[in-house]
């Protein structure tokens, strides 16, 4: 009976000592949190291993994350994974569609995003761009002649239209002189002419008798305007004037209309401020609805795919610029010792328990072996 009691005692003591030793060793990883002094003498193994080496642990964790966890190869594989890409595209389509279907006005949406004075800025920007474009256009075209500035098609149309313009002018002239107003104007012109010639009117009156001068001149004027020769003459005159105009510099226009006036006229016609205001007062849905399907089905997938491709090609540079090792190091360094202990224990709790149990098991086995040795030695 004493033999079995001795074996049980040695086994139990060995298990208790082995289990408690491992439990104490685990506790000493974290505790005490601060060094303990007896007078000026620091007690050995204080503070615990992890509190003592926390800064080194932070550095090593940062290196481990960068070198073994968040590697360019691992992230690159994830970004090129077909299922991941499909999921990301679907998520992006859903989120973009929510924005597109928003019934709030663009103005309200921009205010929510803290984008202030957008209307004034957009108006000024558009007016600035228009002004710059007009001035650049004028600066270029002022170096040309009209023949160089006008498109060839316009030149052809003008030249083809000259005979028609001549015919139109003559037709309007005939219609005018056939009217009472035209006859009156012609009569006044004749009277003014003879008034400046003195007795010439009396001499003409002797030849014409009772018929007025205007009645004789009016048919001749109309006849003259209706002749083909007159039409050709006017056409030739217009053609010569057109050729002269084509040879003149466009810059001559500046003496009649200043650049600032042209810019001001264009801006007034465009009504930029009014247009921008109307645009911003529209809802997001109204603005995007005409192109909604294109955005969802084409733009979003294309943008996501290109973004992932760019990310894959530049993942190493991105990770380097993020300085992940420093981020992890800084975060771990800010942890209190208690939080760091809780973090490690939450991950390794079961394993540490098993280490304690293993210590008890080994201690029990050693105690049992000791008991057996004592038995045989007796």
Curated annotation (Swiss-Prot):
Keywords from the named record: Cell membrane, Membrane, Transmembrane, Transmembrane helix
Transmembrane spans: 357-377
GO cellular component: plasma membrane
Keyword hit for Transmembrane: yes
Record localization: Cell membrane
InterPro entries: DUF445, UCP032178
Membrane topology qualifier: Single-pass membrane protein
Highest taxon of source: Bacteria
Transmembrane helix in keyword set: yes
Similarity annotation: Belongs to the UPF0754 family.
Record PANTHER family: UPF0754 MEMBRANE PROTEIN YHEB (PTHR35791:SF1)
Name by which UniProt lists this protein: UPF0754 membrane protein BCG9842_B4423
Organism: Bacillus cereus (strain G9842)
Organism taxonomic ancestry: Bacteria, Bacillati, Bacillota, Bacilli, Bacillales
């Amino acid at each position: 009976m004493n033999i079995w009691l001795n074996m049980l005692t040695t086994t139990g003591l060995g298990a208790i000592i082995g289990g408690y030793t491992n439990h104490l060793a685990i506790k000493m990883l974290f505790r005490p949190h601060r060094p303990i002094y007896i007078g000026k003498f620091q007690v050995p193994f204080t503070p615990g291993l992890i509190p003592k080496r926390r800064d080194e642990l932070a550095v090593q964790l940062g290196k481990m994350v960068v070198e073994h966890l968040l590697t360019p190869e691992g992230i690159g594989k994830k970004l090129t994974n077909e299922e991941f890409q499909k999921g990301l595209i679907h998520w992006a389509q859903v989120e973009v569609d929510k924005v597109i279907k928003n019934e709030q006005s663009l103005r309200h949406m921009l205010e929510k995003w803290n984008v202030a004075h957008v209307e004034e800025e957009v108006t000024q920007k558009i007016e600035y761009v228009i002004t710059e474009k007009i001035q650049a256009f004028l600066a270029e075209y002022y170096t040309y002649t009209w023949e160089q500035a006008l498109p060839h098609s316009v030149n052809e149309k003008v030249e083809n239209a000259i005979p028609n313009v001549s015919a139109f002018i003559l037709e309007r002239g005939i219609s005018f002189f056939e009217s009472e107003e035209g006859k009156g104007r012609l009569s006044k012109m004749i009277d003014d002419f003879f008034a400046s010639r003195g007795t010439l009117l009396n001499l003409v009156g002797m030849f014409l008798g009772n018929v007025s001068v205007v009645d004789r001149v009016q048919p001749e004027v109309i006849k003259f305007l209706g002749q083909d020769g007159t039409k050709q003459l006017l056409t030739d005159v217009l053609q010569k004037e057109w050729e002269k105009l084509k040879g003149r510099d466009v810059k001559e226009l500046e003496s009649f209309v200043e650049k600032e006036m042209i810019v001001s006229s264009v801006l007034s016609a465009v009504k930029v401020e009014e247009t921008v205001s109307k645009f911003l007062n529209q809802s997001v849905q109204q603005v995007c609805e005409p192109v909604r399907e294109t955005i969802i089905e084409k733009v979003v997938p294309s943008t996501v795919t290109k973004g992932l491709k760019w990310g894959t090609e530049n993942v190493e540079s991105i990770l380097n610029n993020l300085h992940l090792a420093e981020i992890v190091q800084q975060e771990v360094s800010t942890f209190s010792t208690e939080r760091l202990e809780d973090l490690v224990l939450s991950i390794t709790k079961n394993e540490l328990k098993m280490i304690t149990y293993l210590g008890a098991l080994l201690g029990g086995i050693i105690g049992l072996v000791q008991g057996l040795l004592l038995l045989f030695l007796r």
